[in-house]
Amino acid sequence: MVYSHHHYDHIEGGKPFKDAGATFVAHMNAKTRLEALKNPDVVIPDIGTGNLHVIELGGTRLELHYVGRNHSDNSLVMLLPKEKLLFTVDFIPIESLQFRDFPDSFLPDFFDSFDRVPSVDTQNRPVVDT
């Protein structure tokens, strides 16, 4: 289970997965923040990552990239390189710069983090905003 970042709407509901034996991964800053909460309903990540963490599972490679401060100081970008799928959460704008007014957002760093997002040849595939 990968937490994209520490905000509650992205970390809630993990207990059944943990009970089933899942390993939880998040950026080290998210892990530190969640440990400080001391909330028994929040699963603390087992692994805190740095700038790059690779998960190989069943022949599939998932890369977790930390691209710097933006929507939070611990947002991860997820890349499936073989499939050419890139997942960003809450900080890549399609029509506007989203979610920039959270207390832990880093507006000056948003644009720098865009430059660090892994490049993917999309072969004219659509970009979907969620």
Predicted regions and their residues:
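Catalytic cores of transferase enzymes with a strong primary signal for eukaryotic protein kinases
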Residues: 2, 60, 80
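Active-site HxH/HxHxD metal-binding segment of metal-dependent hydrolases
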Residues: 1-54
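Short, isolated positions in well-ordered beta-strands
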Residues: 62-63, 85
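Metallo-beta-lactamase
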Residues: 54, 68-130
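Short Gly/Pro-enriched turn/cap motifs at secondary-structure boundaries
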Residues: 44-46, 66-69
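Short, P/G- and charge-enriched loop/turn segments at secondary-structure junctions
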Residues: 51, 63-66
